[in-house]
């Protein structure tokens, strides 16, 4: 591969443009720098910025189909070999505080032995871990190590989010044992988050597995083994997601049963109350007709005796319901 001049990739509004120093650190890219396999360049762009979009559309360093892919709409994770380079699309957890984490952020990467071009629109939180290591001098030393570290950070964040969802399910199951029903829509949102994670993490696991199996010239055998470990770790996370989805289905049935039992209990209570007061309602209605005068209306103790009879009648009905084991 021919060397690349720093001026060819120094985009003014880039998120950052760095050169890997080969010792785990980075330095800012200068126009006079020479980019080769010993000192690769990492160019990170926000493709909606004007200068970045113009560079992506006009640079001769990228194949034509790569330009469109790096600035296109979000797609599912995939990997494509394009001559000496590789185009990779990955998804990561959304770290923005005003959006849901399951609204995954897309990151697209084109890389060969000399150049790493990564693009995004929303911030990729997992890259902060890689950037921190590079600034401390403990980061990757080449393109293969960079890709492994990025995939490892993405998987760490995904695993943390899956663990958070798992903890929510455990709390929900404990509450259901105490007959506590979650707020409306809570279980549906939880299930949607699991399904979205399953949709994107499954192909991302396949991307990791393919990167581990293919003989990329800029990846060593040790880096391929690490990539396979990352794929296996994400696969275990997918197994956890599948188990959580099944558990949410069981909980939905349990919630429906609890609500049905509560409704039946309330209906039964109202029916018993109607049975208790039905005889007294009949008598008060009968006396209230008053077609031929109220019986005992002229007697000073008539109303009191009538009230006592109603209380005795209600007590008798309640006693009968209790002995019949209805109450």
From Swiss-Prot:
It is a multi-pass membrane protein. The chain crosses the membrane at residues 274-294, 301-321. It comes from the Bacteria. PANTHER family: CORA FAMILY METAL ION TRANSPORTER (EUROFUNG), ZINC TRANSPORT PROTEIN ZNTB. NCBIfam families: PRK09546.1 (NF007092). Zinc transporter. Acts as a Zn(2+):proton symporter, which likely mediates zinc ion uptake. This is Zinc transport protein ZntB. It comes from Escherichia coli O6:K15:H31 (strain 536 / UPEC). The gene is zntB.
């Amino acid at each position: 591969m021919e060397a690349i001049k720093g001026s060819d990739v120094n985009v003014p509004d880039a998120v950052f443009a760095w050169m890997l120093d080969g010792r785990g650190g980075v330095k800012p890219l200068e126009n006079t720098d020479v980019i080769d396999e010993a000192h690769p360049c990492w160019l990170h762009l926000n493709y909606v910025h004007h200068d970045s979009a113009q560079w992506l559309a006009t640079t001769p360093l990228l194949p034509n189909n790569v330009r469109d892919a790096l600035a296109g709409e979000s797609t599912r994770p995939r990997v494509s070999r394009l001559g000496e380079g590789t185009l990779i699309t990955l998804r990561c957890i959304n770290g923005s505080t005003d959006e849901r984490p399951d609204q995954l952020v897309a990151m697209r990467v084109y890389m060969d032995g000399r150049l790493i071009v990564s693009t995004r629109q929303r911030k990729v939180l997992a890259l902060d871990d890689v950037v921190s290591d590079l600034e401390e001098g403990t980061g990757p030393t080449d393109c293969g190590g960079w890709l492994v570290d990025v995939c490892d950070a993405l998987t760490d964040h995904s695993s943390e989010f899956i663990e958070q969802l798992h903890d929510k399910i455990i709390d929900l199951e404990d509450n259901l044992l105490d007959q506590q029903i979650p707020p409306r829509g809570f279980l549906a949102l939880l299930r949607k988050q699991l399904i979205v994670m399953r949709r994107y993490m499954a192909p991302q696991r396949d991307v990791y597995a393919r990167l581990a199996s293919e003989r990329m010239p800029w990846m060593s055998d040790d880096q391929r083994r690490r990539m396979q470990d990352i794929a296996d770790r994400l696969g275990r996370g997918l197994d956890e997601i599948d188990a959580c989805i099944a558990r949410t289905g069981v909980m939905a049935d349990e919630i429906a049963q609890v609500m049905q039992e509560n409704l039946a209990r309330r209906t039964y209570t109202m029916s018993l109350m109607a049975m208790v007061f039905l005889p007294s309602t009949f008598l008060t209605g009968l006396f209230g007709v008053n077609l031929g005068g109220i019986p005992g209306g002229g007697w000073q103790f008539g109303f009191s005796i009538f009230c006592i009879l109603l209380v005795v009648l209600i007590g008798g009905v309640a006693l009968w319901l209790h002995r019949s084991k209805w109450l």
